[in-house]
């Protein structure tokens, strides 16, 4: 039987950036091959650093998919754990080591007997940086294994062990990266009339763009426009010719995201025109679409977990964090949910350390749900 805690600790020590998960893939394949030995209803494919494990059903009417992400983050770990990251500047700070371990545990249980329906276990690379789910879909990595329904989870530090949370609508926001560069004319600080100050123009933009959310977004729907980087100038007595802004747009529907993207671009171009300078606007959303649960499937999943002993089901509000599972759910009906890990530190924090008793709870809950779906 798979040692869940040791498996998680092994994976925790080898975090890798998206599409560079070579050691992770090798470790996963080794475990998967041991679990599937002698199971003639199993097929395995790889796609770059990703893995697909397909269980052929005995009387299939549909394919049920379970997706887990496998990449780490460029973070220096500060947990002090004896099994801390062995890769300098890399850490599983988003719980993907937990996600992988739970998926392996569920695979082990699913292999106990051939399912009626097909089951697909997807070990997806590059959730954090390149929207690996979108890359796999666009490259036809699924082929005829593409699920009819897709499910997945994400750990959540502020939920207690034993708590599962989701809803029948949107769970995660769609996210869009924004880069804006104003190009004016540099000059001496004493002669501003001979220059065209990009810093001033960019400052006007930062204040004016706040009106996009307050005046263009339905307050019931909500959206976020945040700029976390503002770079301009090199010294106190020189007017800079360029100013660079780097930020993010987040919205709970794709229509709202597109509206906000359009308005941010329009405001930037309007400010540039007012200051008689050039502007470059780069909007990059890629595969980070809103994670929109299928209402009927979500209700089914919620009812199932609500009746499970040891599980506290929570009907939760959407989060403005992003997840590339949204792209796959835009192609295939499915559901994502949160799994509580009771950590005082947030996701992406260098001291984030989930409670390991969650592993057995997660495997028991998810595997029982997948067995139900596979038997329908």
From Swiss-Prot:
Q: Does the keyword NAD apply?
A: no
Query: Domain of life of the organism in this record?
Result: Bacteria
GO MF, one term, reads: N-acetyldiaminopimelate deacetylase activity
User: Active-site positions, per UniProt?
Assistant: 69, 128
**GO biological process assignments:** diaminopimelate biosynthetic process; lysine biosynthetic process via diaminopimelate
Task: Indicate yes or no for the key word Iron-sulfur.
Answer: no
Q: Where are the transmembrane segments?
A: none
Q: Give the Pfam families listed for this entry.
A: M20_dimer, Peptidase_M20
State the EC number(s).
3.5.1.47
The alphabetized UniProt keywords are: Amino-acid biosynthesis, Diaminopimelate biosynthesis, Hydrolase, Lysine biosynthesis
InterPro entries linked: AcetylDAP_deacetylase (IPR023905), Amidohydrolase (IPR017439), Bact_exopeptidase_dim_dom (IPR036264), Peptidase_M20 (IPR002933), Peptidase_M20_dimer (IPR011650)
Catalysed reactions listed for this entry? N-acetyl-(2S,6S)-2,6-diaminopimelate + H2O = (2S,6S)-2,6-diaminopimelate + acetate
Which PANTHER family would you find in this protein's record?
A: N-ACETYLDIAMINOPIMELATE DEACETYLASE, PEPTIDASE M20 FAMILY MEMBER
Q: What does this protein do?
A: Catalyzes the conversion of N-acetyl-diaminopimelate to diaminopimelate and acetate.
Cite the NCBIfam families for this sequence: amidohydrolases
The record's similarity note reads: Belongs to the peptidase M20A family. N-acetyldiaminopimelate deacetylase subfamily.
Q: What is this protein called?
A: N-acetyldiaminopimelate deacetylase
């Amino acid at each position: 039987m798979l040692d869940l805690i040791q498996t998680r600790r092994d994976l925790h020590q080898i975090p890798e950036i998206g599409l560079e998960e070579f050691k992770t893939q090798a470790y996963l394949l080794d475990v998967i091959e041991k679990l599937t030995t002698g199971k003639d209803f199993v097929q395995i494919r790889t796609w770059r650093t990703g893995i697909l494990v397909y269980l052929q059903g005995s009387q299939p009417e549909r394919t049920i998919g379970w997706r887990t992400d496998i990449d780490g983050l460029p973070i220096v770990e500060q947990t002090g754990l004896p099994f801390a990251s062995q890769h300098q500047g890399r850490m599983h700070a988003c719980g993907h080591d937990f996600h992988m371990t739970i998926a392996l545990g569920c695979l082990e249980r699913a292999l106990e007997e051939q399912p009626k329906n097909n089951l697909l276990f997807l070990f997806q690379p590059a959730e954090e940086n390149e929207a690996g789910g979108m890359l796999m879909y666009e490259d036809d990595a699924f082929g005829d294994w593409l699920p009819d329904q897709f499910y997945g989870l994400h750990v959540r530090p502020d939920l207690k062990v034993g708590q599962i949370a989701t809803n029948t609508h949107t769970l995660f926001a769609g996210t869009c990266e924004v880069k804006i560069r104003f190009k004016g004319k540099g000059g001496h600080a004493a002669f501003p009339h001979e220059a065209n100050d990009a810093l001033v123009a960019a400052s006007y933009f930062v204040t004016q763009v706040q009106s996009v959310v307050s005046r263009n977004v339905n307050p019931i729907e909500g959206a976020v426009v945040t700029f976390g980087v503002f770079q301009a100038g090199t010294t106190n007595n020189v007017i800079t010719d360029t100013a660079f802004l780097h930020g993010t747009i987040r919205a709970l529907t794709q229509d709202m995201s597109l509206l906000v993207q359009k308005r941010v671009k329009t405001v930037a171009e309007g400010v540039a025109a007012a200051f008689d300078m050039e502007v470059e606007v780069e909007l990059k959303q890629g595969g980070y679409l809103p994670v929109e649960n299928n209402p009927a499937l979500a209700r089914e999943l919620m009812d199932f977990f609500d009746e499970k002993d040891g599980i506290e089901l929570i009907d939760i509000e959407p989060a403005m964090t992003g997840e590339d599972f949204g792209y796959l759910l835009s192609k295939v009906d499915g559901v994502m949910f949160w799994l509580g890990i009771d950590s005082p530190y947030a996701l992406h924090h260098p001291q984030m350390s989930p409670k390991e008793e969650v592993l057995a709870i997660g495997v028991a809950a998810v595997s029982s749900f997948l067995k139900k779906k596979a038997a329908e």
